[in-house]
């Protein structure tokens, strides 16, 4: 089984930065994870023996079972060391919720480079940093700090922006729109849109893919993946950057440079993806796709 498949269907999950502190990200993530009855959850916190009545461990090395997925919610400066510990423990996938990386400047960029060096050393996959995580309603798994779970459905939604992703998720819950996957990719140090399209293209629960994109990541990988699946599964993209204000806003969110918009426009067309211009159009696309009345062919 590939690292991506293990990452998105883990049997064992460690939450590094788990806490009982009310309002803390580490508490909300743990509460969400504990609702997944089919997975073993291991809180990691060196300062306590239990978190929310679940036995806690001082470090991932102390967890008594092999960990498939680690979710990291610790301060940015601690993250390289945490990722190193995950690598030593044989963890296959890491979701870094923590913020304070390239979006804040040079110091954060250096932290990302160190994390990427460690990732390559151990061959693990990393989502984030500065991301919300992912939700797989079809599996009853919520590895984010967002409240509310959308019902299971056939639409996958992928976003770089956490704020936009959160708004879409809130709307989907209120509208009863179902998702096969919700994923917030953040800074895309490793897992990017190409990886997600590859994974979702082969995912039996997914019939269509909606994307909010600030920067494409690995353009060649994205084009290859989109061309491979766009004919079978509609790929609909909202990408800001047609106007200067949109480009600046996108850059401030995740440190992603918007790039030449005409290049993106041509690339989406060649890949067979459909570009929409406004969030309302993305909502409308979700409603149409959720109706399960896709045109033949």
Where are these regions (language model features)?
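Catalytic-core regions of core metabolic enzymes
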Residues: 1-297
């Amino acid at each position: 089984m590939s690292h991506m498949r293990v990452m998105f269907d883990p049997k064992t999950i460690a939450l590094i930065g788990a806490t009982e502190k009310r309002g803390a990200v580490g508490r909300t993530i743990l509460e969400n994870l504990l609702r997944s009855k089919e997975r073993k959850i291991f809180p990691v916190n060196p300062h306590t023996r239990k978190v929310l009545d679940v036995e806690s461990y001082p470090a991932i090395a102390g967890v008594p079972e092999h960990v498939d997925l680690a979710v990291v919610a610790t301060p940015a400066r601690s993250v390289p060391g945490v990722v190193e510990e995950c690598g030593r423990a044989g963890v296959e996938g890491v979701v870094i919720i923590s913020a304070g990386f390239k979006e804040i400047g040079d110091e954060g960029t250096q932290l990302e480079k160190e994390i990427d060096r460690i990732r390559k050393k151990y061959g693990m996959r990393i989502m984030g940093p500065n991301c919300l995580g992912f939700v797989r309603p079809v599996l009853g798994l919520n590895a984010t700090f967002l409240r509310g779970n959308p019902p299971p459905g056939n639409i996958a939604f992928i976003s770089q922006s956490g704020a936009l992703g959160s708004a879409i998720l809130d709307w989907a819950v209120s509208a009863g729109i179902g998702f096969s996957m919700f994923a917030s990719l953040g800074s895309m140090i490793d897992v990017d849109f190409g990886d997600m399209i590859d994974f979702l293209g082969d995912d039996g629960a997914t019939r269509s893919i909606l994307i909010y994109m600030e920067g494409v990541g690995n353009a060649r990988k994205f084009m290859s993946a989109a061309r491979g699946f766009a004919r079978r599964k509609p790929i609909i993209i909202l990408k800001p950057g047609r106007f200067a204000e949109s480009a600046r806003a996108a850059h401030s969110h995740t440190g992603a440079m918007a790039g030449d918009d005409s290049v993106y426009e041509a690339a989406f067309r060649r890949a067979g993806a459909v570009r929409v211009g406004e969030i309302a159009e993305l909502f409308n696309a979700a409603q149409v796709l959720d109706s399960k009345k896709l045109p033949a062919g």
